Amino acid sequence: MGPGLLCWVLLCLLGAGPVDAGVTQSPTHLIKTRGQQVTLRCSPISGHKSVSWYQQVLGQGPQFIFQYYEKEERGRGNFPDRFSARQFPNYSSELNVNALLLGDSALYLCASSL
């Protein structure tokens, strides 16, 4: 593997559309380079007002990033300020990661609840 390959940061989302729970995430797969910014989107199940974001690094369990309820942040995991999120009036949510690092390569999961 050449050193140029180590500069890529791979971000993946679960599924290729609606997942079994009815949550929709986009984009489904994303490749960025270090230093770039990424925005991940989540549409919750209809009627759900709470959205939570998780990061799952290969070989590890999911780690909590954020929870929003009715557009207010209700919880934040131990992640740097490069990670931010927000929730919109329709209860959809965005997760933003700035200045990507190789360690940000992971599966990013969104869950919704009442």
UniProtKB/Swiss-Prot annotation:
PROSITE patterns: IG_LIKE (PS50835). One of its GO terms (biological process) is adaptive immune response. Disulfide bonds join 42-110. Glycans are attached at residue 90. Its main location: membrane. GO terms for cellular component: plasma membrane; T cell receptor complex. It is found in: Cell membrane. Keywords: Adaptive immunity, Cell membrane, Disulfide bond, Glycoprotein, Immunity, Immunoglobulin domain, Membrane, Receptor, Signal, T cell receptor. Alpha-beta TR is a heterodimer composed of an alpha and beta chain; disulfide-linked. The alpha-beta TR is associated with the transmembrane signaling CD3 coreceptor proteins to form the TR-CD3 (TcR or TCR). The assembly of alpha-beta TR heterodimers with CD3 occurs in the endoplasmic reticulum where a single alpha-beta TR heterodimer associates with one CD3D-CD3E heterodimer, one CD3G-CD3E heterodimer and one CD247 homodimer forming a stable octameric structure. CD3D-CD3E and CD3G-CD3E heterodimers preferentially associate with TR alpha and TR beta chains, respectively. This is T cell receptor beta variable 5-5. The lineage of its organism: Eukaryota, Metazoa, Chordata, Craniata, Vertebrata.
